[in-house]
Amino acid sequence: MLPIHRSFNTLSLLTLINVMLITFCFSVEKTAEKNKIDFEIHSGYFVSNKFEPKKPQSFIITNEQKIFDSAFGIAFVQGDDSNRLKEGSLKSKIVISTIKRGSFFCDYDVVSLTNNKGELELRYNLKKRESSTAEYSCPLIISIPKIDYKSVKFIENGKLIKNLK
């Protein structure tokens, strides 16, 4: 009878561990969901060739129109349906941006933007399409409601590449 009792205790312990793991997973998911920040992705801009032209990657966090305009210009094309910032929107928004430069074109896919006690974390995936004939400056431009923050972490393809404080 004793081996059955031990077996029952082992089974009970395994069940308890599984329940705890499931609870923990849902708790982490709810916390991440709660910390998400609403954001908007903007397009229809080119990067000024005077803005940090020698750097392979640049980062911008601003709510000042003058700084934004020093980095970006409006790219007009026929049939344009770009999502540009509305005039005056930087009075109530912050722009978070990264710019990749090189002989490739970039496709960005934003995974999430979260706020953990003032530490913003921008997670995105980047796919490069190589070019043998041209150099590109590819911006990812995001706006969020104006909030207090301590730092912004840029996490590209799962790796921390910059922590701006």
Segments predicted by a language model, with ranges:
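Bacterial Sec-dependent N-terminal signal peptides
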Residues: 1-33
